[in-house]
């Protein structure tokens, strides 16, 4: 009985100590007045956004060049006026599949796997994506490998081969994603909201399994 009483007493004392300590901390915190934000003084902030050089090529393409010598890395981003809203009726999803295939489908004279291996060998990275009204193709490579990397990047942009096997895989993955959309209520709600709000407009069209199956090389 003495042992039980001692244990219970210890638990009670410990609990009271914790409660009193918490009250003390809360009281101390509440007694510390916060400074008036209107009376806070600080040095004026100085910021000058970097200025990019703007060039227009003979073909009408506009370039923005911004040197940054902090790292020996060259980053290139190409923005194209395209997107899912320009997909032909009945072939919704073609813009997204095109972006996927740009990164995996290979180029003339080189398979997709060979392109991946070459990019990895020079620590370069390529990524393509599209939204409703634009497409973005990004590339980064070390300065010492710029010539080799830029040659490969330009071939990806101008000579994609869209391997049949990689296209079939991309279509299967997209159709599986569409099948599983009912498992994500938020994603499903956004899709249906876009369909309703833009009803009758190209922006209101949605990708379906049937439209994906209709896409061929």
Task: Give the predicted meaning of each segment.
Residues 4, 25-65, 73:
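Proteolytic maturation boundary segments
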Residues 54-56, 62-66, 75-79, 118, ...:
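Soluble periplasmic/extracytoplasmic beta-strand elements of cell-envelope proteins
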Residues 77-140, 205-207:
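M16/MPP (pitrilysin/insulinase) zinc-metallopeptidase core fold and M16-derived inactive scaffolds
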Residues 104-110, 140-173:
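M16/insulysin-pitrilysin zinc metalloprotease superfamily fold
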Residues 115-121, 161-179, 190:
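Acidic/histidine-enriched alpha-helical segments
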């Amino acid at each position: 009985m003495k042992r039980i009483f001692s244990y219970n007493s210890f638990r009670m004392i410990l609990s009271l100590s914790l409660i009193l300590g918490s009250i003390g901390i809360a009281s101390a915190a509440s007694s510390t007045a916060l400074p008036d934000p209107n009376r806070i003084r600080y040095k004026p902030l100085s910021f000058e956004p970097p200025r990019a050089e703007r060039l227009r090529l003979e073909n009408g393409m506009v370039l923005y060049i911004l040197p940054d010598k902090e790292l020996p890395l060259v980053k290139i981003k190409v923005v194209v006026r395209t997107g899912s809203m320009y997909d032909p009726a009945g072939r919704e999803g073609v813009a997204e599949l095109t972006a996927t295939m740009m990164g995996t489908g290979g180029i003339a004279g080189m398979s997709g796997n060979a392109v991946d291996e070459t990019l990895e060998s020079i620590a370069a990275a390529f990524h393509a994506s599209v939204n409703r009204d634009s497409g973005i193709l990004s590339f980064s490579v070390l300065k010492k490998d710029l010539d080799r990397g830029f040659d490969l990047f330009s071939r990806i942009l101008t000579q994609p081969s869209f391997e049949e096997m990689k296209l079939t895989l991309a279509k299967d993955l997209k159709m599986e994603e569409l099948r599983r959309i009912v498992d994500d209520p938020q994603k499903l709600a956004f899709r249906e909201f876009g369909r309703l709000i833009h009803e009758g407009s190209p922006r209101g069209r949605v990708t379906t399994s049937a439209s994906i199956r209709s896409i061929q090389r």
